[in-house]
Amino acid sequence: MTTLPYNIRPNLVGDYPEIDQSALIDPSAQIIGHVKIAKDVFVGPLAVIRADQRGPDGKVAPIRIEEEVNIQDGVIIHSDAGASVTIGPKTSVTHGAIVHGPCSIGRECFLAPRTVLYKVTLEDHIWVGMGAIAKLVTLPAFTRVPAGSVIRERPEVLGLRLVTDAEREYMKEVWAANSRLRMDYLELRNKAESIRSLTAEKTAKRMG
């Protein structure tokens, strides 16, 4: 049996995280319980993804992080008992954001620093501005939530504008930058592992 790092561990029910080998998980991040992380995901320092709240059936609903998502420093992802979270492909969840399920986030969304989401559905290509709060709503595709706003009701959603071409380009740039970081850190880790392996081999030969 493979021994997992302490920062990647089961919940009280015994659900272990499932993490694709291509994902990059910072050693200071915490991945706990029924978490499914797909290929090419980046999870930055001090992020917490924790699926451990049992529902009425005694089971823990999953937190799913789909392909090429980047979860940045200090992000917290959790959910109510029996509730799941899904974050769609190529979405950026930036510094200090909180996603509390039940939540469903579509593909290529952008959550700016310190945003808070609770019991929401975000369709694709949505921009949530810095420090904004969204609760108990569904946001249509290409919606832009202004920084610092609080969105809790349907009329507030209807008053939001669509993202501009410039904002969509910025969203792509943020995603691309973090995708490069994942590849660079993986390359650095692989080099370090090769050096350790070579050093251990030389030491064994000398002692043998």
Regions of interest found by a model, annotated:
Residues 34-40, 139:
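Short, T/G/N/S-enriched strand-turn elements that build extracellular solenoid repeat scaffolds
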Residues 67:
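A cytosolic small-molecule/anion-sensing beta-strand core signal
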Residues 70:
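Glycine/small-residue-rich phosphate/adenosyl-binding loop
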Residues 2-18, 46, 50-52, 56-62, ...:
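Glycine-rich hexapeptide-repeat left-handed beta-helix
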